[in-house]
């Protein structure tokens, strides 16, 4: 398996996951695929989300010959993973909200989950709460507006602090001590969240856990390939110049100059608009 790692999201949120994976596997090549034409996913019907995501991801997997797919979107992960795993012959990794570690770390036994309206309403999320946080008070907060604030920041536009404060006011008033960032967009505005909520609220996301999972799936294969071929392993099966892989981005709607700068800041060397089926 020598193709790139395909990281998928509705927008720029998956960049936070991409960054964590790249820390673990810097020599791998990557394709960052984002469906910005249909952003935000939290407002889509389940059937529309499943159909669109599966078609887009499968199309791009074939195009770039990806060796693994990371669905770096909580909303999509709650719905599309079973379908993708039926359609594809390569590993598919999804995002699980960090509810289990949040429950373990909470001293007050009062945690919150901040995600899109779709994620907080799904049985999948409520199942995680029942399984891992029965001994905690768990407050659910759904916001698509916060997704768009993160997108604005990525486009180099100022964050609307008044709007941010209005969204976060119920969280601050709840007196919880651990907040799960149940949308991959939200680590992009972690600094703003921390500034408003204060140091007493611990913010948790799943980026590092996803990176560990991807590495566990790829590293044994890379090691086995190196041992059987007699070659030297330099951190990944598809190494770039001096052990650093390249990242290509693909998107479904034209991007702004500001967002292009953000992509470059994440090490993305080139990008292109793709036509969906």
From Swiss-Prot:
GO biological process, any: regulation of cell shape
Entries under SUPFAM superfamilies matching the protein: Aspartate/glutamate racemase
Taxonomic superkingdom: Bacteria
Molecular function per GO: glutamate racemase activity
EC numbers on record: 5.1.1.3
InterPro entries: Asp/Glu/hydantoin_racemase (IPR015942), Asp/Glu_race (IPR001920), Asp/Glu_racemase_AS_1 (IPR018187), Asp/Glu_racemase_AS_2 (IPR033134), Glu_race (IPR004391)
Catalytic activity: L-glutamate = D-glutamate
Binding site residues for substrate: 9-10, 41-42, 74-75, 184-185
Listed NCBIfam families: glut_race
Known role: Provides the (R)-glutamate required for cell wall biosynthesis.
Descriptive protein name: Glutamate racemase
Gene: murI
